[in-house]
Structure formats: C-alpha cells, structure tokens
C-alpha cells in the first residue's frame, strides 16, 4: 500500500514561510503551512472596517526593484498603485518643501538643487553616492563592514542640516530608528533600492502580497488557526495546541525570533538575537478630499520631538482603501511614547492641526495599531545572515535572521527551500 510522503511542515504563514512553501511546491515537494492567526501574512495584514476602509497593520510599501520580490510576485495581478518618488518634508521651522527623486523625475533636478534642505555640497554628495552604488549587487553592499548610519553620513561629508531635515525623518522612518544607529551597509542597500525602485502598494492593501503566494499553493496546504506548541525529534515531529501530532520530513520555523525561541524551548532564538523596533500606526478618516491635493507624496516631519513622524494620505494613492466620498489618513509614530491610545490620539490631533490646519480636528479616529516587533534592529557588526539550518531536518527563515526587509524575508525563505530540495529526502 502506497502512503503519501511526510510533508515539509512550515510554521508561520508570513512572507518568509509562504515564499519557502512556494519554492518547495515549485520543486515538487509536499508542503503544509501552519499558521496560528486567522489569515496569512504575518506582519503584512490588511483589516477591513465595517464601513469599508482597508487598514494595513502599520504603514508599509513595496519597493518594486527588490530582487526577491521580482522573483516572487506577479506585479501585474496585484493592481499596484504608486507613490511619487520623493517626499514632502516639514522642516523644523514649520515650513514645507518637496523633494523629488531626480532619477524618477529628471525635470525636477534643478528644483532639488534649489531646495532649502541641505547645501549645494550636500546635494552633490547625493549624486556621488548614487553613482557609487549604481550597478552594485545588493548582496555585495550588505556584505561590507559597517558603522552606524549616522557615522557614515558624517564621514561621507553631509552637513548636520541635511542629516536632521532629510536623513533622520526619511531613513529613520524606514528603519524605525530616528537615531540612525542602523548599520551603514543596510543604509547603502536601502538607498540604492529607493533610487532604483517604484514605491508601490497593491490597490486593495498590502495583504494582497501574501494572499497571492498562498493562492498558488495546493488546496489544504495552509491551515489557519493552528498554533504549534512544540517541535520535536530534530524537526520530524510537530505538536499542535489542539493535541494533534504531525510527522514531517523537515520543519521550517518561519516565525519571529521570540516565537522561534519558544518553539525550540530556548530563552533566546537559536541564532544571534535581534532587538525589535516598535511603531504605532494611527488611522483617521476625513470626509471629502484630503489636504494633500492628490500629490501622492509621503509627508515627513523633521521637527524635533514630534510624535507625528510621517503621514500618508493613503486613499490618494489607492482610492480602493476608502469608501466613496471619504479619505484615509495614516499617521506613524516610532518608538516608545508611553501614552494610552486616547492620549496618543489627542496629541496627534494637536500636531496634525498645527500641520494641516483646523480641518484635522474633525478627522475621525478609526483604529490604532501598536506593533511591538515591527522590524528587527540591524546594528553594525551584525552578520548579513545567520544560520538557516539548525539540524539535518530543522530550518529557520525570516527577516530577523538576516536584515530588516521584505527582500530578506522572501530571500531566506527561498534559500531554505533550496537547502531542503537538495538535502532532505521525503
């Protein structure tokens, strides 16, 4: 009597786990993805309110030049919507200025030179860095020795004025680290990607990314609402919270660092642990058109001490995230603020009124997301990638074992799938 081979069991249906499952399925290996939550996506989730707003769990974007994303996604099927490549920056004195990416909008190059952000030398240095990074493979950038981003910027010759008015609000938002303690090799990677990529979101929200991957897998190969309590026998046995025991050809831990540690019965992750960055995303609804006037730019706040770090008028990028006649506003606050949801909302309103005028006082609070482990920290000296293989039949993947990026989550998932395909028999 023929019996089906034991599947590769992947714990976690976030981006890394789904990427791993997709590549294994393409290689003809049976897979079973176990997810504790009620939907796929991990941190990449979109909630729909009763009145029809689509709220991503935290402000998120897709950089279309990510090598792993280009391998993984069918962009045409995602109905992508684009931000303009640049930002509107509110300076310390309250004035606003618009920065355009000159590689995406060459006609704006002279306007960029006239911007009050930075000196002429600062702007020429940006051109110098663009030229230095052009054509270099991302893995080469990430493999370099590193210092903090702040030290790198100063060593490169940029003034404190452009550091405070551009690099802190922009890259501090990317890293969730306004102090710019993140490693400089990751800065070069991110800088290169922003210069070369379109900045996009799926029209119906970021959860369309994991759903596209999950929909490629065979029916029944993703089990939701299925928490795992332990992994045993070096990755050959999986114990579920409902008492069920599953046999596996191998196990892939595609969970965050703390969940991985728990499943391994350890106080810390098996690989070098990373601290996590905290962010809070607060959503507001406004009747009629938002005050951004269709510019589709991310609004950055360079004012020291502000709780509002960046603002996105999300429905100007994709009208589908808000019901007809209303607009959706996303407000991000990074780091620990020590405020209750009510206190935070009130403080944000005060700052938003100061920025956008009295109409902001009328914006209706929809929901607040406090995301404790939004991104792993990535500081100088940290290896570009930790061990993906823990034993002959036990593996781990995710951005926390590499660097804090969707590209890393997808890439480590692919690499684990390749290891299993070559070295693990069913």
PLM regions: where:
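N-terminal glycine-rich dinucleotide-binding loop that anchors FAD/FMN and/or NAD(P) in oxidoreductases
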Residues: 47-71
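Mobile amphipathic helical/loop "lid" adjacent to a hydrophobic cofactor/ligand pocket
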Residues: 66-70, 79-180, 195
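Glycine-rich FAD pyrophosphate-binding loop
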Residues: 25-50
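Conserved flavin/dinucleotide-binding core of flavoenzymes
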Residues: 314, 318-426
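Helical element adjacent to the flavin cofactor pocket in flavoenzyme catalytic cores
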Residues: 187-242, 246-250
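N-terminal Rossmann-like FAD-binding beta1-loop-alpha1 element of flavoenzymes
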Residues: 6-33, 421
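Short beta-strand to alpha-helix junction loop
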Residues: 60-67, 141-147, 156, 192-214, ...
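Mid-domain catalytic core of redox enzymes
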Residues: 229-342, 346, 354-355, 385
